[in-house]
């Protein structure tokens, strides 16, 4: 997760990768359409933008902005970006304003970059891969997982199980599917 760099610094672990952070936010607003379909658009910055039905509410977003820290919060600029984009793309009876925001969600995406000394700022931020990287130290039996997406967690888990086995930890049944199957 986003704290592996801090963990590695505290334990003295040297790795080939590190993180840069992309902050994403979503706003929860009253239901904006009677339909229960996810709406997708391209935002002004060219990335995908969503309106996701949530019972009597709609989750709208997201942003993709650089963050220096895994600790983040919604800024006025973030909020306005989301409101402006949804208002431009839907012909609502009344445009959404800050007063319509019921709740806000904010987090960072840990993006993996090489630890070669470059800070990742010279790369096209929106084109950076959301893939993961794994650094292992067999001498200390240390595994660091960088980047990745929740939707790929099963594959990452299988990969990590392989590294754990390589380090001499006997897995109870390597053929057993561990992700919710009986």
Task: Give the residues covered by each predicted segment.
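C-terminal catalytic lobe of FAD-dependent flavoproteins
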Residues: 3-59, 65-182
């Amino acid at each position: 997760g986003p704290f592996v760099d801090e963990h590695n610094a505290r334990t003295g672990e040297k790795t080939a990768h590190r993180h840069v952070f992309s902050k994403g936010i979503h706003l929860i607003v009253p239901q904006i359409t009677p339909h229960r379909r996810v709406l997708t658009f391209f935002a002004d910055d060219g990335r995908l933008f969503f309106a996701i039905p949530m019972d009597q509410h709609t989750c709208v977003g997201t942003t993709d902005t650089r963050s220096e820290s895994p600790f983040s919060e919604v800024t006025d600029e973030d909020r306005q970006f989301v409101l402006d984009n949804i208002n431009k793309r839907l012909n609502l009876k009344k445009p959404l304003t800050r007063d319509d925001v019921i709740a806000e969600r904010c987090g960072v995406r840990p993006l993996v970059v090489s630890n070669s000394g470059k800070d990742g700022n010279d790369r096209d931020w929106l084109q950076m891969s959301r893939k993961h990287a794994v650094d292992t130290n067999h001498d200390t039996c240390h595994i660091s997982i960088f980047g990745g997406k929740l939707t790929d967690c099963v594959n990452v888990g299988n990969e990590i199980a392989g590294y754990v086995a390589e380090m001499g930890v006997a897995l109870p049944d390597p053929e057993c599917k561990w992700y919710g199957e009986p």
